[in-house]
C-alpha cells in the first residue's frame, strides 16, 4: 500500500491522507484500493459509487466538495489533473516505487515442450509460454505476457508491447505513459503474421485473449481489450482500447471496434464496419458507423432504386 502523503508534491494540496494500491479510472473494477482522478462533479459522483476507489485526485476548485463527500476517502488537489495523475503513474513505475506499485520481476518460464524458433525475441523476465506452443521466427514477446498451451504465434507478431497512451502538456510537448499491465493469452490461440497485441496500462489490469480464438494477419488489438473464447478476427481488423468482445464473435476484415465498445456473444461485425456503439448479442452490424445489417441493406437497396 502507498499513502498519499508519501507521493504528494510540494504544489499539491493534501486535504486528507489515504492509502491506495493502484491507480485507475473512476469506474474501474480492480479488486484493490485505487487512487483515481475526477475533473468535475459528474466524475466525482461516479468515483464515490465505486467501492474500489479509496483516494481521489481532484482540481483545486473541486477539493472541498470531494473532501466533504466522504470522510473515509483520501483527497489530494492538484493543479494539472490528468497530467499530474499520469506523471504519478510514471513515477510509481520507476525504480523507487516499482516493487510496491507494479510487483517484482520473475524469470521467464518456457515449457520444455514449446517450440521456439531461435530467431524469436523473448523478454528475459515476466514471460510464460505453455506446453506445445509454437513461436515462429521474428516474433517479439515483451515482458508481462503469458501464453497458454497449444498456441501458435506466427512470424512478425509483437505481443505485450506498449500501446497508445499520451498526454498533451501544452508547449512542453507530449507525455508518454508507461504500460505496466499484462497480456494474457489462453489455450489453443493462433495469432497469425504481423499482428500487434498491446499489454494493458495499469499493473492490476490485463489485455486478454480467450481460449480457441484465432486472429488473422495484420490485426491490431489495443491495450486493455478483452477478447472472448472462440472469436474469429479477420485480417486488418482494429480492436481499440478497452473494447470487450464476447464469445463466438466474428470480426470481419478491415473492421474497427471502437474504444470501450462491447460486442455481445455470437455477434458479427461485417467487412469494413466501424462499430462505434455496443453490438447486441447474436446481432450482425454493417457500415460506417455500423448499424443492424438488415437495416443497412434495406437502405442500400432504396438508394440503388433511387427511392
Where are the language model's segments positioned?
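Structural signal for interior beta-strand "rungs" in well-ordered beta-sheet cores
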Residues: 37, 103-292
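Terminal amphipathic alpha-helical/low-complexity segments used for targeting or macromolecular assembly
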Residues: 1-107, 112-113, 150, 156-157, ...
